[in-house]
Design a protein with these regions (language model features):
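N-terminal Rossmann NAD(P)H-binding glycine-rich loop of SDR-like oxidoreductase domains
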Residues: 17-34
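NAD(P)H-binding glycine-rich loop region in Rossmannoid oxidoreductase-like domains
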Residues: 57-96
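Conserved catalytic-site region of short-chain dehydrogenase/reductase
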Residues: 81, 117-129
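A short, basic/flexible loop-to-alpha-helix module at the beginning of a structural domain
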Residues: 2-13
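SDR active-site strand-loop-helix element
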Residues: 21, 71-75, 114-119
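Adenosine-cofactor binding site in Rossmann-like domains, unifying the SAM/SAH pocket
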Residues: 42-61
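Conserved small/polar residues in nucleotide/adenosyl-binding loops
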Residues: 129-136
Length: 137
């Protein structure tokens, strides 16, 4: 993740307006923290209550008001492996809707760069990862 953020942030103005969609999730919070550590001060994050990314009108209004220059899209409709397997159509539909809204408004508003991170499931809540080993080099 650090290599990705090092590459992405080397070209950004420290005062640029940066929107991190999904800033409270696993990946989005890591991006937010990394940007803060690198001295970025104009970060925008909205909770689901503040901005429903499934609502295209609300997303357009947000982009109209905030005018972000850069967007990290780490937001997703999530629910765990079991819910993902039971409600597959709901998950793909809602996630495509979020992506369409954020990517579409980024394009319409002339966002300089957008980084889209997509995954159906990152980590289950209660699973042991003891079988994984750390890289040796």
């Amino acid at each position: 993740m650090n290599e990705l953020l090092n590459f992405q942030t080397t070209m950004l103005d420290k005062n640029a307006k940066i929107y991190v969609a999904g800033h409270r999730g696993l990946v989005g919070s890591a991006i937010w923290k990394n940007l803060e550590e690198k001295g970025y001060t104009n970060l925008i994050g909205k909770t689901h209550t503040e901005l429903d990314l499934l609502d295209g009108v609300a997303v357009r209004r947000f982009f109209d008001e905030e005018q972000p220059e850069y967007v990290f899209l780490a937001a997703a409709f999530v629910g765990g492996i079991m819910a993902n397997s039971i409600y597959r159509a709901d998950f793909i539909y809602k996630n495509l809707q979020i992506q369409q809204n954020v990517i579409g408004e980024s394009f319409r508003h002339g966002v300089k760069k957008l980084l889209f991170l997509g995954s159906t499931c990152i980590y289950p809540r209660a699973v042991s990862y003891t079988h994984l080993t750390l890289p040796t080099n």
